[in-house]
């Protein structure tokens, strides 16, 4: 038997640059080697690949070359060399290129060498560039192993490496001699990688070849099958052995390559035409720069293609048809098409995809011309707008990229020539008719051309082709013959509710798959997105089940996903509840002719009033058009019954079916005309329409005062003058329910008639649409200041004048297209409204925002929500985490203090409230918990308790989402009963909540304290067993049902800390958090957990410069030993590292490591004395720590404890005790929770690690896979080791999305690396017992060294004002500078006016001026010298702090430049605020019975009012010696801080007495007048107490100014000379009540000074020592 020649192969060859050098086939290794050896003679052949590819394919090449060289007649015989490099983008660098070149030089390769690049795009780009430059150019061949490389990077001769400035910025055009496409390699490719490559295949077809694109649209399943079916015995190498799937795959690849090859041949050097292959790449590359390496190139390009196609649509170049086809095609290959795709949205990096960030990245693009961005614009499928990239303005790109929009209020400009403001347009095809037409055409006999089909998320084709550039859909009907999909293939419908309901019955018609299909298919599964899984489908399923179709629910009862058996639609008599959705009725009607019963179907609608009858009539009318007539029965009197007879039969397709424009969509442009007083005509919708919503103009708009003219196929509306719409007293919209949202926004401003209220009825079904639309409209209209009330069948809207609508509202759209479009109508008359989730309109009118601007003529702008939500911090030291407003649950034993902790937590979270589940239970069931248990028993109580829990968190008792979650599921802290974990059902529900991203916190307290408390507590049912037994049973349940723990314990604060707000624990009391420190820890913990005030501090900038960060290593066996010195120890530190492995419990001195319980106590104790972030480290002995390497179980328990305690940073060792999967799971969990960041660390104590070696690169690559930060520690044996470290850091940080890196060398020689490290440098302190590592320095030492190196230049700071000779500010700031080792100096600059030469000279020193304080009398005058003000300074109208900020920007030439801006701020109000909240909690201050008093009306009074408004004090009294000034000041502060305060600002005639009309004595008093302006009452002035003594112009202070006695209260006197002012003296004299805390002016000065210090330096001021010195100095003065 002859042996087949394995070097022979049947190929598809593609020509490029006049040469057939691209060879495509299967199993080509022998052919490649033979071709190279025979046609490219050489002395040396070098194959370069990476570790991953080498394992799969290198051995075969080595064998083939050995065999080929042995047969070679060459003399001497050539050499074959191979070189394997690390995989990944890190190798594609200057250093990586140099290493390959060194290999070639070492092996004495010469110019005749031939290099083979075997691998993906990285290998091809890198090796190609090496070939282009080695010996000034050698021959090379591309052998791509990924589909992406086959169709893209290997073709065209582009070679390049990356640099820190961007990807592919250094390279050359260097054409390979051959490109060998071996499609068999794709069999080893993961499916996701195949999809990655298909993005480029779709791209080439989209820009060049519509025929190929059409093939791609319809044949995705076959292409996937080709790579998922392994070819045995080299099948495919020859035509005889090549399967049809292989032929399709190869022709698809060759066709894509052919497009690019043709373009390259015409434009090799990318002067114009070659730009076209960058379609999708301009935006795609920007996305990739943020998301790499998590998201693949093709996935980013896929999103980029859609966004660039939408950009073309926005510019009026591409129709929605093209966008829709492109979207569906990409989705067919499992590619994401939007930034909200789950693959993208689930990533932590997704929050970085801000519009400014993407636009900034897009600046660096080789297609650009100067500052002009160039993008390839699609004209239609298969053709581009220009034969090159087109210039596009940033504004247009911003609008496309933004996730939200704002409509600029204006009168429409219109699109009718000669008639300004008049609009004539058509809307997209009706969704309702499109969906029905698709089903009818697919089930019918023959061919049907559907025109004006809606191209949207909600319409999908069956068997189809496109005509007229996609304007016409050609459907080949199947006569009812359908087959169950292949196993594992589900029908995913997104949020397409209509499609889901129609297809439920359609799937019951499907026939089982042929026996030849193995494994056999059984049922059809239809599913959708999360929202789709909430929408009801139960009544339809019930009807089909009753008819014999055994449909199964795969998740929640009554919702998708469904499992539908084949051939199960029996027919005959069917009863259906139609009071929820008419779509259930239409689903059965459409399929009825194909039911099995010979007599067809008799459909009877039961269960109350039928909803949306017009849609049922529409279905029947369309069925008649397709050849089947439905009969609706009548009774003897001729009254129509809800019974329908449908005969068996076969639909017959009409040749052409024109789909009406969507009447629901038509309501929006018509409503724009109505609300703006303009004219609009909608074509293709009139009185003959099948759609009920076509009546909207006549039945609603005309009655609201519009002129309406309607023909059979056109509707014209002329609105009344602006503001003259009239409310209809009551309108029944049952025949046009979807249009009620449009009517609602018009009703909101229908203020033109006598009636101001408009009642809309007949819309009950709108509660179960994409969202509860009635509730949605009520909630969102409320944001505009519009009052509504809800009824069973609808709602009533109470109109307000347009001028009174609230501005700058952010509208949440609930992923509902109709909500978004309705509020876009209202936004045409109200400023600043932001429509979130702009893309939800894609369901029915994808181009709405473009049409609103281009056709109607109202400007629409993009809004970057991520940018709006970003925290603004002038110091820039906070890292953001996403804000999550889902409610936080508290669980734990009764008596742990859940209620108290919950109340404090809710009070500390802006906009949050507290709810006690037991109280909610009692209010709902109208009985106390104790009585309920007594009467009904524990089992019944647990059932009701579970129902309450489900209701509060917005889930069903089965853990599934519900359609209308309660308001308690957001922005609430919910305390649950101690026994909530007793039942499996409740535990499952809590775990389901956790799994969905909810927060459940276990509140703990020492069990002995709990026992003491419960032994005397009688309010709730007694336990029926010992408390300790209950605790032991529940403890593991609490742990499994919670994600975090919070310890409610009393920790004695160090000496000097304020012991405010003491609440002693004792019988009947559980408030253990009794100190200010305890309150602060509650605020920190829950603020961090919710993402409202994240406690991360590892990055940022100060004055536009990179801010270095440091952490102090605590090396105590018991951290409580550090508490007396904690303020000094933490000077300069941004975080504390808790070395868990070094902890030693004195009660277990022999234990090799601490217990979990001891560690929890240590963390809890540490939290009470410092709010600094904790770096939680369990260092193993292998990496220089104390934890035994063999105790894996205990190590994992300690790490888990850190996560549960919510530590901000968790140090996890690379190559540690954790397996790769465990590390990945841990990383995934922490990223999902968002409260803990992982520091992936590696410590080499051996000194063998070289910073320029391969080992450190591999460790770094491993660490960056799961670490939010990377820490690598080596050992310096010589000074040069530090230089190598810096080089490594520079290279590592140049990679896209490289995490922050901590890189240091141990030993004394390594100290320079600690000085130069920028992120989280570990520091020690002289007061610590030991250093954590050799070579550690203190923070102060590092600052001094940085100054000597010129990296921390000297700065000068000043105080502007007069008189200022005795100011305490120099002492305050200079003490802080000295303690931290900062080379700064603070001095006085006294002048008669602030705008003088001396001041101008100081502030104009751009290098040396660090900032300034401003005091009287210059706080207002100084504003003229500044560039901008902070919001608080603007509101207060005074500046006490000047901050120089350095900002980078791009100039007109595209160059980066830095400018200095002088920013004016006000820290007085912050100082006042801090002093108040140290004495009275924020929750108490917001209590409705709380009031505050401000004495004075000057600049400081403004700061005091601002502070009280910011705290939410509901009533603020203002008293001044000159009442007119107080009244002027009150007018300036209407609306309060940031215009969000809605309390009362009351100007008093006198202090005390009845406190005006309000009658509430103040709990907070702030005096801003000099001490000399007040006086204690005397015998002669007692009669005028509370008023101004005109003889002295002093305020006589009445005793009842301190009348408040119901709780803690505070008086702040801003004057600090004398120390004891008359106001403070009076407070002390009356202090027998014990509730008034006194604050001297110097304390406020200190607090505001601490804030100044941090804003200038980015460092926390060392408060305790600074305070001590200032008070000493004050005493001297």
From Swiss-Prot:
The keyword Chaperone does not apply. ATP binds at residues 892-899. NAD(+) binds at residues 50-52, 89-92, 120-122, 125, 145-146, 167, 185-188, 196. Disulfide bonds: none annotated. Its cofactor is Zn(2+). GO terms for biological process: amino acid biosynthetic process; aromatic amino acid family biosynthetic process; chorismate biosynthetic process. Residues 1114-1341 are annotated as: 3-dehydroquinase. This is Pentafunctional AROM polypeptide. It comes from Coprinopsis cinerea (strain Okayama-7 / 130 / ATCC MYA-4618 / FGSC 9003).
